[in-house]
Amino acid sequence: MSKTQPIKPRMAQRATLSFGIVASQYNLAYVQAMADHAQNELNQLEPGASVALVWVPGSFEIPVAVKVMAAQRKFDAIIALGVVFQGETEHASLIANSVSMALQTVAMDHTVPVIHEVLLLKNEEQAKARCLGAELNRGIEAARAAVATARTIREILPRF
């Protein structure tokens, strides 16, 4: 696990951004913590930003909800949050691979940043370290990546 977080973007200087978060209800305690941290970080970095949080039953359902949000063209970036634990079978890997590919496809098809924090973890210890703490929380990382990428795209668009 990386011990460093992405650089915290500067405070907003102009029009606020709009963010979507799609979160899995499965392994709720971990995902809820990531969602809370992501929302708090988005509000700190982009005061007044619009943040829409949508819950889906499990990680496999995240991409379709992300696609619906992306198709609306109302969001500058969308964050996907979930926790999948590896078990004795290949099921978790199949879910993780499918979700990863689908999220990238949505991002490319709709030209919207999709920040992928659907975590494939070995155990609860890894989940606690990545989801519950404030120091290396993946929700915070997702929010920082969403803000930085959305701002970059806003800078690029007028040039072309």
Predicted regions and their residues:
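Glycine/charged-rich beta-loop-alpha catalytic/anionic-binding loops adjacent to active sites
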Residues: 19-20, 50, 84-88, 124-129
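Residues at secondary-structure transition points
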Residues: 25, 29, 33, 49, ...
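Glycine-rich oxoanion-binding loops at beta->alpha junctions
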Residues: 54-72, 117-119, 123-125
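Glycine-rich phosphate-binding loop
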Residues: 65-103, 160
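Short gly/ser/thr-rich secondary-structure transition/capping motifs
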Residues: 1-5
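Glycine-rich phosphate/diphosphate-binding loop of Rossmann-like nucleotide-binding domains
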Residues: 9-53, 57
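Short beta-strand segments
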Residues: 23, 80-84, 115-119
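C-terminal binding/interaction regions
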Residues: 17, 92-160
